[in-house]
């Protein structure tokens, strides 16, 4: 006798309470009415740039894309700045040649950009609370809000690295090739007004208001149909 049931159930999707624990050292996750706020950090303080944070960002973004309860995502950073420090002991495995370094640079670093662009099929907002660097996740979002004191830079050249990751590509895209190259090759900072004038950010708001404004926009999107806002973000 046939009971008309499928032979196997759907594969389990990740649940918020599960991956909150997985990524607790790198992000605070809060969800309300389908709007997820991702607050980057390291332990209980500002996120420190490291191989570990690189991997956490790319992996978390991929996991978020698998949880259909995340209908809108806001990316922000703990405190009044974006990432402003580097972990002095956070890059040791990058020197382990050849396999470890390749895995870091190809799977972790490249996927940090790729996952933001291709994995997230829902509207995203970057809410930048102040100055910093490594601003990829905020500026790869559909809408980016920053505070009026925000200044950013592409610091690689100063650290002995050739610039050209997502920050470099976005500089060339928004500022133009020549001016983008100038910012990359001199590590000169660009201001909130520079970014607004060139379409790199959507709005500039007073200090302390970036996250609040991001939630206002997210709640406005929630008034649209799920299908409309989801397809619109792609």
Where are these regions (language model features)?
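Alpha-helical segments flanking ligand/cofactor-binding loops in enzyme cores
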Residues: 115, 135-136, 169, 181, ...
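Glycine- (often His-adjacent) and acidic-residue-rich active-site loop
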Residues: 69, 77-109
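Hydrophobic, secondary-structure "cap" segments at the distal end of domains
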Residues: 168-178
């Amino acid at each position: 006798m046939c009971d008309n049931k499928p032979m196997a159930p759907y594969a389990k999707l990740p649940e918020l309470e599960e991956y909150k624990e997985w990524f607790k050292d790198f992000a605070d996750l809060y969800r309300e009415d389908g709007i997820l706020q991702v607050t980057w950090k390291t332990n209980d303080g500002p996120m420190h740039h490291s191989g570990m944070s690189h991997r956490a960002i790319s992996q978390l973004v991929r996991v978020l894309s698998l949880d259909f309860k995340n209908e809108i995502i806001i990316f922000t950073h703990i405190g009044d700045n974006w990432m402003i420090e580097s972990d002095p002991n956070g890059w040791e495995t990058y020197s382990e040649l050849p396999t470890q370094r390749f895995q870091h640079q190809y799977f972790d670093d490249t996927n940090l950009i790729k996952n933001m662009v291709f994995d997230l099929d829902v509207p995203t907002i970057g809410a930048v609370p102040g100055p910093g660097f490594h601003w990829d996740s905020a500026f790869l979002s559909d809408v980016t809000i920053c505070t009026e004191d925000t200044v950013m830079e592409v610091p690689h050249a100063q650290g002995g690295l050739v610039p050209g990751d997502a920050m470099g590509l976005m500089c060339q895209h928004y500022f133009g090739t020549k001016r983008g190259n100038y910012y990359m090759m001199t590590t000169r900072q660009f201001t909130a007004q520079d970014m607004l004038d060139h379409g790199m950010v959507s709005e500039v708001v007073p200090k302390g208001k970036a996250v609040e404004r991001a939630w206002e926009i997210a709640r406005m999107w929630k008034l649209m149909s799920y299908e409309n806002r989801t397809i619109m973000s792609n």
